[in-house]
Every structure is written in C-alpha cells, then in structure tokens.
Amino acid sequence: MADLDVPPQVPQSKTRDLDKLLLRHGNLVDPGFVPGPGLRDDIRDYVRILVIGAGGLGCELLKDLALSGFRNLEVIDMDRIEVTNLNRQFLFRIEDVGKPKAEVAAKRVMERVSGVEIVPHFSRIEDKEIEFYNDFNIIALGLDSIEARKYINGVACGFLEYNEDDTPKRETIKPMVDGGTEGFKGHARVILPGVTPCFECTIYLFPPQVKFPLCTLAETPRNAAHCIEYAHLIQWETVHRGKTFDPDEPEHMKWVYDEAIRRAELFGIPGVTYSLTQGVVKNIIPAIASTNAIISAACALETLKIVSACSKTLVNYLTYNGGEGLYTEVTKFERDTECLVCGPGILIELDTSVTLSKFIEMLEDHPKLLLSKASVKQGENTLYMQAPPVLEEFHRPKLSKPLYDLMGRVQKDTIHVFGQRALKNNEKESCTTKVRVVFKGADGVADMDTAIGA
C-alpha cells in the first residue's frame, strides 16, 4: 500500500485565543480599545501585576494570568505550605510542605509557562513600603481575610488624587480585582477607586465574625466548636500563662485538640476532630478547587479587560453559587460619596499656628475620624511616624512645630493619615484615610464654612 500523503501539522500559536480578543474589533469593546499586535506586546512587556495571596485562589490566579499573556508578575504571601493545602492548591506537592507558598507557586508557574517572570515575596503585606504597591498597574487579590482586604484597599485608595471639582485624576487610579470563595460560593469584583465602590463602601456585605460568649464556653458548651474554643481561649491561658498561642505550631494545636476532646467527653458532646480544631482556631474558610478555578477565571478576564479595553469591565460585583446547579449574577453597587477611604477626604480648616501635635489630637476628636495613634504623610514627605520607636524619636521634634510650616507653607493640600479607628464594640482597627487641610489666613485662601467637626 502506498504511503498516504499526510499534510504537515501547522503549529498553533500560543497566543491564538488571546489574539481573537486583542487583534480585532468587536461589538462589546470599550471606546478606548485599539486592536493590534502592539497591544498584545505591551501587555506582555510592560504591564505589571501583583497577586496578593498564594493559596487556593492565588495559585489559580497566577496560572491564569500567566496563560493570559501577562509576563511580569509578582506574588506576596506570608504563609508556608501545609499538608491540608495539597488537595486544592494544585501548585504544591508533598515535598513542598513547610516551604513558603509564594516562592513555590512562582517557581512552578515559571516551570510550566515559558517566558513568564514571577517575583515571589515571602512576607506580610504590612511589611512592604507603601510605594511598593504603586509600582504595579493592577493589584489582584486572592485573600481570605477581611482585615487584609481593608488594608490593601486603603493603600490603593491612598494613591488616588482628586481634581478641584472632586473628580478623580485618572492617572492616580490604582485598579484592584478582588476574588473570594467559600465552599460552593464565590465573588469577583472590580474596584476602581473613585469610580466604583471600594471595599470600605460595601463593608456591609461581609457578616461580622462569629464570637462565642465566654460564659457559654465555660459553663454550658453545646457543640464541638464550644469545646475547642474553651481549650483555645480559656484553658491555654490558664495553663500556659504568658506564653503566646501559635496556631501554626503543631504542638500547640495538638494540645488544644487533646483538651477539647476531654472537654467534649465531659459534657457528652461528639464531633471534635483535629481538622475541626484547626478550622475553629484558625477560622479556616472551607475551599473547593472548582470554585477557586471559576472565580480566578473571572478575575483574570477582568484584569485583561482593564489593561486592554478589549471589553467593558464588570459593573461591578459578580456572585457565584454552585451549591445547587450553577448560578451567577452581576450587581451594580454604588459608591459611598462620603467614604473616608476612597472619597476626596475629610475637609479640615486650621489656623496657621496649629502645631502637628494639636492636629494629631484633632484627628482623634473628629467625629468622622476618631483616629488615634496617627502617623501623617504629605506626599513623599513624612511628617510623623508613631512606629517603630526609632522613627518616632526621629520625628518627635516636629510635634511642637506648626503644621503649616511642616507642609511647606502651602495654602491647602491633601495629606494621608494612618492610625487606629475606634469601633462600636470598643475594639480598634488599622485604617488609612485622606484629610484635606486648608489653612485660614494663608495668602490666597478665602474663609470657608467647614469647621473641625464638619
């Protein structure tokens, strides 16, 4: 039989699917979309993306972004790999247990996707200088913590500047794409500070963390979680006075588990397991690999849409529920025009004689701020830092000087203040906000009717 003529296979371009989005027009493109190879190359060569979190969602995000044409990625995560991560955080292997998540995730994606460069950062997000985050075009969030989201939201909104008419300056907008999952549920959202609601504008979407009354834990435990929290919150302090409990220390977790078992047996309560103990103590949110994959895909697509304008971005909050079938919905939430984080800032009118120390006291007394232990920055100029002690000592002499002089004798300017805000339950949270300072009596400044309590 004669040999059949088999046509040679044409190699498929790695960017074939991406080219369909970036090289041609469409009915749903953003008005600013300019298709062409140059756009694809710019995304590859110049766009820098920071992925925060290298867990279940973060692993998916790194993979999806690398396969979507982004070549300059960085990832930050403070955690190390645990055995319990391996079933859903697909970039990790058993031999990786104990290693930093960010470093292993970056290494694995670079091994699989040629040409991509991923810089890992094994650290807390708070340990990075604020300007570190300003070096990126987009920040993609794969976090499981409300506190971490609020911190990054404050940082990104801190870069935002407003025009005289209180419209945001486009070049100062730091886009964020936020994803979150819990079991079969998830969300993806686009945050354009000053344009769409920031995280603080919609904080009401997140329910308060469940807390157990201590009297219930001590006297009438009714379920396994009560027994675990009793061992964690009460017995640990009683037995190990002065020793800090470390949830990432296996010996500490084993001690809590053993004590919870004894407590449960005493009251005839079933269900205490080691995995449940970890979940209760560390407030672990249940995660499913398929949910992470779906939400990550939505986040990666929104990231591509923001940088390329190949389609209009999500407006502005996508919810997903895969518990009973498949359900998605997009909701348009509105900005809080008086938001202390993404808004133009609280307006405070001062005399030119007001000292920095007096101004910091005013921040604590202001009814809309209630900001204690405040640090103050004016652009790149640090006026005062509460911590670390060596910096506080360095800036301390400024406290007695007029704020007007420290700010370069400008008539008005926007400054950033970082401190702790009092909550209704007497707890405090770290926050960043903007304050618009106007000096009465300075040349060229007309009297304003906005007082310190406005």
Swiss-Prot record:
Major site of localization recorded for this protein: nucleus
Species name: Arabidopsis thaliana (Mouse-ear cress)
Keywords, alphabetical: Acetylation, ATP-binding, Ligase, Nucleotide-binding, Nucleus, Ubl conjugation pathway
Alphabetized Pfam families for the sequence: E2_bind (PF08825), ThiF (PF00899)
GO molecular function per UniProt: ATP binding; NEDD8 activating enzyme activity; protein heterodimerization activity
GO BP annotations, alphabetical order: protein neddylation
Enzyme type, top EC level: ligase
Protein known as: NEDD8-activating enzyme E1 catalytic subunit
PROSITE patterns per the UniProt record, alphabetical: UBIQUITIN_ACTIVAT_2
InterPro entries found in the cross-reference section: E2-binding, ThiF/MoeB/HesA, ThiF_NAD_FAD-bd, Ub_act_enz_dom_a_sf, Uba3_N, Ubiquitin-activating_enz, UBQ-activ_enz_E1_Cys_AS
